[in-house]
Amino acid sequence: MLKVGFYLRELNFRGIANSIYIYAKNNQTILKNKSIIFYNSTALDNRPEAITEFKKKFKTIKISNLNELERINKNLKLDYIYFQRDGSKDEIVNNSKNIIHAVFPQNIFQYHGSNYAFISKWLSKTCSNNKFAFAPLPVQLLKNNQNLRAKLKIPKNAKVFGYHGGETSFDLVFVRDVIKKVVKQNENVYFLFMNIGKFFNHKRVIFTKGTFNQTQKVKFINSCDAMLHARSLGESFGLSCAEFAIKNKPIFTYGFCRQRAHFEICKNNIIPYYSYEDLNLKILSFNKDRKYNSNNLKKELSEKNTIKIFKKIL
């Protein structure tokens, strides 16, 4: 049995924390290893609810820096310490093997640690011409068909466009402007956000708090007919996009973004838009009854498949 430490620079509702939680769980339940969580107690974006969920499942240790982790490891004797971070050369823990899982584009000179891998095939291809491995992130969605429409007073026949992600990640201004126009044009269209800073006050533009609760997350996604993605940078993986796609939802996303992993991962569900006018037209003409099938993606990003690939980067 291996002892694997998982380090989080911040412990919150975002994709890194979610994917590390699933990796750490499956490292124990499937690979039969030991998972120990370390998180930076000084991070301003830590969320108590997320910390509580980790503590329920794992030994969870707060630290203020990696030197402290190194001191603790003199007794723990971890076999590996896993970092999911931007991928540029950074601090490591010298008395353990370090696994670096890079989430952003990096050139090959940023390679460091014992093993180095990207989180998507797109990153590996773009940054290393496929020379470096990639290990896709796991997607965990509970088998639950319930939704939040009744609770949020959204009619069953309404068209609902939703998004969840980092608080500032819905940052394309022209998309926000389209939303403001659409709610005036069509009373049957709703917009639903989770963990996004409120940018408009309207009864059909609904903002809900972020959560680490997987049941609430899947109910949120079930409430939507489509995802409206508006992150100007794009995605180096796109965990929230994959979550919507696996629930057979189409994904409206900006066609000119730089990081395009979600175009490859969710290719059968992507509806690109290119301008204010284009998005406005596509939202108004959207057919919510069209069926999407993501069975192949479900298998590719399943917990069993992704933990097998994770094992290869140890």
Regions from the PLM with identified roles:
Residues 78, 219-236, 249:
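Acidic donor-binding loop of glycosyltransferase active sites
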Residues 8-14, 21-68, 197:
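N-terminal strand-loop element at the rim of the active site
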Residues 250-255:
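Short hydrophobic beta-strand element within catalytic cores of glycosyltransferases
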Residues 63-69, 197, 205-221:
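Conserved active-site histidine-acidic residue motif and adjacent donor-binding/catalytic loop
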Residues 218, 241-246, 260-261:
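Short alpha-helical segment that forms part of, or immediately flanks, the ligand-binding pocket
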Residues 114-145:
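Donor nucleotide-sugar binding/catalytic pocket of nucleotide-sugar-dependent glycosyltransferases
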Residues 137-201, 207:
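Conserved catalytic-core segment of nucleotide-activated headgroup transferases in glycan assembly
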Residues 15, 277, 287-314:
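A charged, aromatic-enriched C-terminal amphipathic alpha-helix characteristic of glycosyltransferases
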